[in-house]
Amino acid sequence: MGHLSAPLHRVRVPWQGLLLTASLLTFWNPPTTAQLTTESMPFNVAEGKEVLLLVHNLPQQLFGYSWYKGERVDGNRQIVGYAIGTQQATPGPANSGRETIYPNASLLIQNVTQNDTGFYTLQVIKSDLVNEEATGQFHVYPELPKPSISSNNSNPVEDKDAVAFTCEPETQDTTYLWWINNQSLPVSPRLQLSNGNRTLTLLSVTRNDTGPYECEIQNPVSANRSDPVTLNVTYGPDTPTISPSDTYYRPGANLSLSCYAASNPPAQYSWLINGTFQQSTQELFIPNITVNNSGSYTCHANNSVTGCNRTTVKTIIVTELSPVVAKPQIKASKTTVTGDKDSVNLTCSTNDTGISIRWFFKNQSLPSSERMKLSQGNTTLSINPVKREDAGTYWCEVFNPISKNQSDPIMLNVNYNALPQENGLSPGAIAGIVIGVVALVALIAVALACFLHFGKTGRASDQRDLTEHKPSVSNHTQDHSNDPPNKMNEVTYSTLNFEAQQPTQPTSASPSLTATEIIYSEVKKQ
């Protein structure tokens, strides 16, 4: 049996492995009852790198140990054996020269390949000739190269073709991801993934699908992304537009028209005037135009790749009408009016001819109203009668097919002088109250005059009655001594009657005076 000790020390081991080995040899002191195990460091290994099969809980008092490729001890698949007494390693049939065994039974495999993927079994031979085994494993993945994207159609036609992208190369145990415009793949019914996500298909390509597109490949040990790829989507032409948008021109002006239609590749243009071909250019220029240049101008756009054609027709009118309309003026019959009483006339004045007039109220077109009338030609606006809601700003606009201009605004103020009925008594109610008060005062005055008159007459009559009874009283007085003692005293009664008309007064809680009051006056003889 040959000795492996010399090759063992000639193997180049990275400094990380040497550091790990030193630590294992220095501090390894497993408990005697622990189970023998192995650990792959790392478990997932990149192809061309190295892996260490680290042993834990190695028993004491051993004769030696051996490593085997697979999940069981098989002499034909022995990698290496190690005798502790001689500290010599002996290669087995499965040894590739890339393996290194350490005194602590750990096994280092360098420059691994995908064929190294799998299980490895350690067998330890104890001094009591009882063997103990432990199995570990690791997986070797390729170091992924930079992928690339292939396409079945790099110049698809919009709304017609489909495009299939494929991420190359095909690699086992690899994940494929796609990116569009530096974003992960969106959810869309037009995007389909197949072949383990290696193939991305775009259905019914549009001009917005130009990209860029990228594919990324990943495995547990590496990742890489392709260079971006863009699509050259052919489309168009869309309906062309002619600029500028002006329709009216003055004689003597220069006519310069430009045509544009979105298209890929760029469209080819041609011009027709009144149906007659003029030239094959994108721009059309006619100097010093006259009224004879009025007519229909047609722009024709063509895409030779898509085979599509589009046209646009624009009408040009050359006229003597003023290209600039002067600013009009508004004149008002009055600017402050009384609501529901007054009317007002607003007149829009301009020196231009061949123009039209329209009116605006509070930044809006003049509303339709039976009270608002426009004269022929819209020169005068009449409002009759003016209402509260008619207050605000008015202005007029004069325009022709070439230009327009607006007047300064004018403010219409609407006043209301009548007192609102809901805030007090109506004028009729106030007049009724005044008349009632005057009538009441007159009745009281008449009643008082009657009372004073009848009162004076009553006092005079009473005075006469008293005078007539005085002699009797006197006689009774004089004859007092002659009266018999038992004779009753004579009593004379005077009656005063006062009659007065009761005046009309408002209803009151106090009782009314009686029509007649009787006063009795008693005169006794002494």
From Swiss-Prot:
Q: Which residues carry this modification: Phosphotyrosine?
A: 493, 520
Residues that the record marks as modified (Pyrrolidone carboxylic acid) are 35
| Topology class, membrane | Single-pass type I membrane protein
What would be one Gene Ontology cellular-component term for the protein?
A: adherens junction
Interaction with calmodulin, as annotated region? 450-462
Tell me where it mainly resides. Answer: membrane
Task: Kindly list the cysteine pairs connected by disulfide bridges.
Answer: 167-215, 259-299, 348-396
Please name the CDD domains in this protein's record: IgC2_CEACAM5-like (cd20948), IgI_hCEACAM_2_4_6_like (cd05740), IgV_CEACAM_D1 (cd05774)
Gene Ontology molecular functions: actin binding; bile acid transmembrane transporter activity; calmodulin binding; filamin binding; identical protein binding; kinase binding; protein dimerization activity; protein homodimerization activity
* Composition-biased stretches (Basic and acidic residues): 461-482
All copies of the Ig-like C2-type domain together span 145-232, 237-317, 323-413
Required for interaction with PTPN11 and PTPN6 and for control of phosphorylation level as annotated region, ranges = 489-526
**Modification Phosphoserine occurs at:** 508
Key words of the record = Cell junction, Cell membrane, Cell projection, Cytoplasmic vesicle, Disulfide bond, Glycoprotein, Immunoglobulin domain, Membrane, Phosphoprotein, Pyrrolidone carboxylic acid, Repeat, Secreted, Signal, Transmembrane, Transmembrane helix
Instruction: Kindly report every residue range on the membrane side named Extracellular.
Output: 35-428
Q: In which tissues is it expressed?
A: Expressed in columnar epithelial cells of the colon (at protein level). The predominant forms expressed by T cells are those containing a long cytoplasmic domain. Expressed in granulocytes and lymphocytes. Leukocytes only express isoforms 6 and isoform 1.
**Topological domain ranges for the Cytoplasmic compartment:** 453-526
Q: Which residues are glycosylated?
A: 104, 111, 115, 152, 182, 197, 208, 224, 232, 254, 274, 288, 292, 302, 309, 345, 351, 363, 378, 405
Check the UniProt entry and state the signal peptide residues, or none.
1-34
Ranges for the region named Disordered are: 461-513
Gene3D superfamilies according to UniProt:
Immunoglobulins
Complex and partners: Monomer. Oligomer. Heterodimer. Homodimer. Cis-dimer/oligomer (via Ig-like C2-type and/or via cytoplasmic domains); induced by trans-homophilic cell adhesion through an allosteric mechanism transmitted by the Ig-like V-type domain, and is regulated by intracellular calcium and calmodulin. Interacts (via cytoplasmic domain) with calmodulin in a calcium dependent manner; reduces homophilic cell adhesion through dissociation of dimer.
Q: What is known of its domains?
A: Ig-like V-type domain mediates trans-homophilic cell adhesion through homodimerization and this active process is regulated by tyrosine kinase, PTPN11 and PTPN6. Ig-like C2-type and/or cytoplasmic domains mediate cis-dimer/oligomer.
What family, per the record? Belongs to the immunoglobulin superfamily. CEA family.
Q: Which protein is depicted?
A: Cell adhesion molecule CEACAM1
The organism named in the record is Homo sapiens
Name of the gene: CEACAM1
